[in-house]
C-alpha cells in the first residue's frame, strides 16, 4: 500500500511539473511576442523618422538644384539677348551701308543718264550732218558715174563685169601659185616625215638574214658509207630518192653526199633521214621507209615550232593553228634567195614600228605584215598567185578585213583600203629592197643589167647610159642638142613603162635622166 501511495504521489508531482512547464512556456512565448512587437514598433518609428529626414534633405537638394537651373537659364537668356542685340546692330549697320551704296549708285546712274542724253543729242546732230553729207556724196557719185559712162562708153553693169573678170583672173592666178606652193610644201614635209618614220623603223629593226640554196651536204664518217648508201644494185639510193623526191649526188667529193632538190621541205626530210641512217648503221629499204616516216614527223614538228616561234617573236597571238603551221612552212621557202619566214617577221616588225609612229593599231599592222606572204607556203600546191592564195587563206580562217586587204594589195593587185595595207606595202618593199636581202644568179643578174641598158639606149636622143646600184638605178645621159628640158620627163616616163612591161626585178628601179649643157668661152 505504501508503494502504491508512493507511486501515486510521484505521478502527481510529475504531472504538476509538466503543467507548470507548459504554463511557463506559454507565458515566455507571450512575453517574447510582446517584446518583438515593441521592437518592431520601435524600428517602424525610426524608419519613419529616417524617411522624413531623407525627404526633407531631398526637398532641400531639389530646391537648391532648382535655384541653380533657374540661375543658369537666366544667364543663358542674358547671353542670348546680348548676342541677338549684337547681330541686330550688325544687320542695321550692314543695311545702312547698303543704303549708302544704293544712294551712291543711284546718283552715279543719274549722272550717266544725263551724260547719255547729252551724247544722244550730239549723236542725233552728227547723224543729221552725216545724212546730209551722204546725200551730197550720192549726188556727186551719180554725176561722176554719168561722166565716166560718157567718157568710157560703158554702162555701170558692163564696167562691173570687166572689173570682176580682171579680179577673177588675178585671184585665180594667185590661187594657183598658192596651191602649188602648198602642195610642194606638203609633199616636202610628207616626204621628210615618211623618211624619218622609215629610217626610225629600220634602225629599230635588226632582223637576221639567211639565204637558202637548192642543195644540202650530208657529211659521212668515211667513204665506205657511200657504197652502203647506194646498196646492192642501187636499191637503197633508189628507195631513198623515190620516198623523198630528192636527188642524191654521190661523186668524188670526199666524205660527203649532196642532196639536190628545189623543195626545201623534202630536202630537209632527206637530210634528216640520211643522217639517222648513217648514225644507225642499218641501211636497207625497210629501214629507209621507217626513217623517212620519222623524219617527216620530225620536220612537221619543226614546222609547227618555227610557226610558234615566229608568232612569239613578233608578238602576234590568236592565230588559227593551221595558219601557224603554214607560217612554219615559210621557214623552208625562199624568194630571190631571201628566206620567206625571216622576210615576213621583218615586214611585221617594220609595219609595227611605222604604225607606232603614226599612232595606228600596232598589233594589227604586225599581224598583217606577218601573214602577207602566207600564200607562198602552198603556192606550189594550189593554183593561183601567192597573193590570191594568201587572201583566201586569211578569209578561210576568219582574219579581219584589214588583214585580208593588206595581203591582197601588198603587190598592188588590189587597191589598199586602209592605212594598215599601205604600211605593209611599204614594209614589204623596204625588206625586199634593202642591200643584201635578196639575191639572184649571176647569169640572170647580168642579163637584167644588159636588158636595162638596152631599153634605155633604144630611145632617140640617148647618148649613153649606166646601170648602177646593183641594177636598182639607171643613169641616162641625153644629147642636149636633140632633147630639150621639156622632153626629159617624157623620156623618163617612157623608159619606166618599158622597164615595167619587159623586166622582172625585185624592189624598184630609179630612172635618172640627165641633160647637160656646157658653154665654153676663152678670154684672150
Swiss-Prot record:
Task: Fetch the InterPro entries from UniProt.
Answer: HD/PDEase_dom, HD_domain, HDIG_dom, KH_dom, KH_dom_type_1, KH_dom_type_1_sf, Ribonuclease_Y, RNase_Y_N
Which keywords does this Swiss-Prot/TrEMBL entry list? Cell membrane, Endonuclease, Hydrolase, Membrane, Nuclease, RNA-binding, Transmembrane, Transmembrane helix
| The KH domain, residue ranges | 214-299
Q: What does this protein do?
A: Endoribonuclease that initiates mRNA decay.
**Domain HD: residue ranges:** 340-433
Q: Which gene encodes it?
A: rny
Family recorded in the similarity comment? Belongs to the RNase Y family.
According to its UniProt record, the EC number is: 3.1.-.-
> How would you classify this enzyme at the top EC level?
hydrolase
Q: Which residues cross the membrane?
A: 7-27
* Membrane topology of the entry: Single-pass membrane protein
Q: What is this protein called?
A: Ribonuclease Y
One GO cellular component, as annotated: plasma membrane
The molecular function GO annotations come to: RNA binding; RNA endonuclease activity
The subcellular location is: Cell membrane
Q: Which HAMAP family match?
A: RNase_Y
Q: Name one GO biological process term.
A: mRNA catabolic process
Amino acid at each position: 500500500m505504501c508503494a502504491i501511495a508512493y507511486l501515486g504521489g510521484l505521478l502527481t508531482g510529475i504531472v504538476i511539473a509538466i503543467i507548470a512547464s507548459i504554463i511557463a512556456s506559454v507565458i515566455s512565448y507571450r512575453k517574447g511576442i510582446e517584446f518583438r512587437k515593441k521592437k518592431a514598433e520601435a524600428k517602424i518609428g525610426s524608419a519613419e523618422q529616417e524617411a522624413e529626414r531623407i525627404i526633407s534633405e531631398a526637398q532641400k537638394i531639389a530646391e537648391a538644384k532648382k535655384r541653380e537651373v533657374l540661375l543658369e537659364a537666366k544667364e543663358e537668356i542674358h547671353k542670348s539677348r546680348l548676342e541677338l542685340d549684337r547681330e541686330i546692330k550688325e544687320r542695321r549697320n550692314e543695311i545702312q551701308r547698303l543704303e549708302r551704296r544704293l544712294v551712291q549708285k543711284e546718283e552715279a546712274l543719274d549722272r550717266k543718264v544725263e551724260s547719255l542724253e547729252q551724247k544722244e543729242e550730239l549723236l542725233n546732230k552728227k547723224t543729221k550732218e552725216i545724212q546730209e553729207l551722204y546725200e551730197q556724196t550720192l549726188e556727186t557719185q551719180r554725176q561722176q558715174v554719168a561722166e565716166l559712162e560718157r567718157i568710157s562708153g560703158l554702162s555701170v553693169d558692163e564696167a562691173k563685169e570687166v572689173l570682176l573678170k580682171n579680179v577673177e583672173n588675178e585671184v585665180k592666178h594667185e590661187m594657183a601659185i598658192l596651191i602649188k606652193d602648198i602642195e610642194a610644201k606638203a609633199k616636202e614635209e610628207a616626204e621628210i616625215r615618211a623618211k624619218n618614220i622609215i629610217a626610225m623603223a629600220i634602225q629599230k629593226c635588226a632582223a637576221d638574214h639567211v639565204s637558202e640554196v637548192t642543195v644540202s651536204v650530208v657529211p659521212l664518217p668515211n667513204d665506205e658509207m657511200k657504197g652502203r648508201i647506194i646498196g646492192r644494185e642501187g636499191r637503197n639510193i633508189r628507195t631513198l630518192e623515190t620516198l623523198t623526191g630528192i636527188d642524191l649526188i654521190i661523186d668524188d667529193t670526199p666524205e660527203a653526199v649532196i642532196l639536190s632538190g628545189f623543195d626545201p621541205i623534202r630536202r630537209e626530210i632527206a637530210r634528216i633521214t640520211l643522217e639517222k641512217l648513217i648514225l644507225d648503221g642499218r641501211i636497207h629499204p625497210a629501214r629507209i621507209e621507217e626513217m623517212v616516216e620519222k623524219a617527216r614527223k620530225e620536220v612537221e614538228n619543226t614546222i609547227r615550232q618555227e610557226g610558234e616561234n615566229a608568232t612569239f617573236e613578233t608578238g602576234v597571238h590568236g592565230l588559227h593553228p593551221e595558219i601557224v603551221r603554214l607560217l612554219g612552212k615559210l621557214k623552208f621557202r625562199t624568194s630571190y634567195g631571201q628566206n620567206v619566214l625571216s622576210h615576213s617577221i621583218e615586214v611585221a616588225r617594220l609595219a609595227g614600228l611605222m604604225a607606232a609612229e603614226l599612232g595606228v593599231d600596232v598589233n594589227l599592222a604586225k599581224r598583217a605584215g606577218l601573214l602577207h606572204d602566207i600564200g607562198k607556203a602552198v603556192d606550189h600546191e594550189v593554183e593561183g598567185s601567192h597573193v590570191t592564195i594568201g587572201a583566201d587563206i586569211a578569209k578561210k580562217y576568219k582574219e579581219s578585213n584589214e588583214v585580208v586587204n593588206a595581203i591582197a594589195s601588198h603587190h598592188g593587185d588590189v587597191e589598199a583600203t586602209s592605212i594598215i595595207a599601205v604600211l605593209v606595202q611599204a614594209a614589204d618593199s623596204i625588206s625586199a629592197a634593202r642591200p643584201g636581202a635578196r639575191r639572184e644568179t649571176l647569169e640572170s643578174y647580168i642579163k637584167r643589167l644588159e636588158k636595162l641598158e638596152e631599153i634605155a639606149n633604144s630611145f632617140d636622143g640617148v647618148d649613153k647610159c649606166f646601170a648602177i646600184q646593183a641594177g636598182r638605178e639607171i643613169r641616162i645621159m641625153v644629147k642636149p642638142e636633140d632633147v630639150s628640158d621639156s622632153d626629159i620627163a617624157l623620156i623618163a616616163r617612157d623608159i619606166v613603162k618599158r622597164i615595167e612591161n619587159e623586166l622582172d626585178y625585185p624592189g624598184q628601179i630609179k630612172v635618172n635622166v640627165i641633160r647637160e649643157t656646157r658653154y665654153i668661152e676663152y678670154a684672150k
